[in-house]
Each structure stands twice: as structure tokens, then as C-alpha cells.
């Protein structure tokens, strides 16, 4: 990774703020499980007390975005009504009840008598999180950071500025009632700060971008700090010859329409040729009723899909009520298409043939591979993680929805009684390498 000349040096003010967050994060990392649980409950209570102000602030952002012609997909993400806010608060309370991710002993090994090695989970340090039009992300990320013992520098899109400010004030007010320093989380407010954040190696340990393909790729190309995220969410649903048509339609509708602006919504529907006529006879009117615009290949157009899909469509993340449709000859045809166009986020198969389903689950190299269920389940909250900071499509861990376990690293601790390597090199001592109970 190289840093672009267009990325400014951090200002003295930003360096000072980042140093304050890092100092608070060091103390946070030493806090105990109970202190961090209480902090999250206090944050949830503060959000509830401030819910009226937060929703009102969001209305201001929505009105401004509407007058500026913000895209429908971004408008959907920007909206934070009372129901959505209450869900985020409930997620925060559930997060407080999850097991402590810190201090877990992953390895316990005797190297020799009185020479014992441990591997213990510890916080990463400070997270730098950049996101667009997702004010509920402030709640998710700040709460995950506190629960996992990490500080966080947050930069939301300008379109959500009023909402983000109202949320961060409530969260800090909640923390002020606890033993956790509110300075562990901070909100950046300008584009210059978000760009300069990319140069804070040494103060920030991980960058997490949540937003458009362009945003994620820009960040990946312009920082030396490790980046966790995905640049696209091109998800596929394959309907096998052995699919139950009613179930297939239900899953397809949910995977596309339940929240089309989500990165785990499907963008391409692949249909086995043997069921394509009967399935599309049911699906075309159902998708029309759901206001989904279908774009098809020549085979699906011959079966009633009205518009043509271009080569570009197969590689497009619509984030809208648009769905590409393709008829494939068999499972291998579906797998070939997925290999070529998938962003390795989430793919699903609908089939009552267990052997076919197992092959799909084994072969598809995506972060999530599902059988007979909606791709919309690819979510940290639905996985029981409490919340997520984002979804990683990289092969190295963490992968998929990243919750608490993805926000910790580990440290090796070795306790001895004066042992030196020379004694093992000359053969005076021998390693036992005996695993001990965790």
C-alpha cells in the first residue's frame, strides 16, 4: 500500500485527538468484564433517553439529503427512525451479555518444567472507522469497540452529520456515568480529517471502511494501516433443479427485497434450466408486485423477463430493486458464473438434493455460503454476535460478519525460572512441549 499525495498530513488537532483516544483505549484495555458490561448498559440507557433528539436530528439530515437528491439506496441507509434506533439499542444490550472476548487463554503449553507458554486474547488498540450514510453504524461500532476493549475514531458521511453528532453525544454521556473514559470514542467531522486518518499509523491499528466500492478501494490504496472490509457485495442465489419452487420464490424475494440497499442482498439470480419455465411463471409477477426490475439473459428473456442484462450487469452491485437473472444448464454452470463474478461475500443455493447442496457449500469460496435460506442472514446480529463492525470478504481472518472475536488479537506470555536458550542449544536441557489444560 502506498499513501497518495492527495492524502493530507494529519493536523496537530487530529494528532492530539488520536493520542487522547489511544491513551483512553490503553486504560479501557485494562478494564474488567463487568466494567465494560456496565458501560454498554449505560450507553444503551443514554441512547434511549436521547432518542427523541436523535430521531429529530435524523429528520434534518433526511430533509437535507432529499433536497440534494441523494440516491435512494443511500437514503434508505441514512434513515434512522424510532424502530431502527430501538433495534440498535436492543443490539447494544445483547452485546453487553455476550462473553468477554478478552483474557481468553487459547494456548497453554509447558515448554519445559517451570517454563510455561500462554496465548491470551487482547484488544487491537484503536479502530479507525469510516462509513457513509449509516448513522446506526456509530452505535454498532462504538459499542463493539468498548466491549472488546478498543478505542475508536469514527468518521461518518456528511449526509448524516446531525444524527452522528447526536448519537456520539449520547454515547459519551452514558460512558461518563461509568468507569470507562468517554475519550475512548471520538467523532471526526471533516473530510480532511477522514483523509488524514489514513496517515495515523502508529496511533490507529485497524481501518474499517463501510460504504461504497469507491470508498473502500480508495482507503485500501491510500494507507499503510491494515484495512478490514469488502469493496463489493455481489451476492448470488442459485435455484437448483431439485428446488422447491414455493420455497425458492420466498427465499429469492426476501434475499432481494427485504432490504435491497444491504450488501448481503442478492444481485443475481441463477436458475437451473429444468425449472426455469415453471419458476419464472411464478416469479415474474411476484417480483413485479414487489417493484423489482428484472434484467435477463437471452434464455430468461425467452421465458418472460422483459429487459436484457448486459455483461456489466453481472458485475454490478445495484443496492436497489434491480435483479439480474440467468438460466444455467446445471450446477457447474452456476459455479462457473459465481467464480467469475462473485465478490466472495455471500452466495446461496436452494435445493432438496443434499449431494448437490453439499458440493455447492464446499466449492463456493465466499465468506458465507448458505443452503435453503436467505442471503440476508449474513449479518453479525443475526449470527448472534450482538452487532458487527462490518463484513470482511478477505480470505485471511477475520472473515464474514466481524463481531467481537474479530476485534481482538493475542499476545504470547512465557513464564520461566531463569531458563536460557543456550542450555537447550547445547543439549543440557530438553523441551517437553506438553499441552496443559486451557
UniProtKB/Swiss-Prot annotation:
CDD domains: ALDH_F18-19_ProA-GPR
GO biological process: L-proline biosynthetic process
Keywords of this entry: Amino-acid biosynthesis, Cytoplasm, NADP, Oxidoreductase, Proline biosynthesis
Keyword Cytoplasm: yes
Origin: domain of life: Bacteria
Primary localisation category: cytoplasm
Catalytic class of the enzyme: oxidoreductase
The protein's annotated pathway: Amino-acid biosynthesis; L-proline biosynthesis; L-glutamate 5-semialdehyde from L-glutamate: step 2/2
Subcellular location: Cytoplasm
GO cellular component annotations of the record: cytoplasm
Catalysed reactions listed for this entry: L-glutamate 5-semialdehyde + phosphate + NADP(+) = L-glutamyl 5-phosphate + NADPH + H(+)
Family: Belongs to the gamma-glutamyl phosphate reductase family.
Name of the protein in question: Gamma-glutamyl phosphate reductase
Organism: Prochlorococcus marinus (strain MIT 9303)
Primary gene name: proA
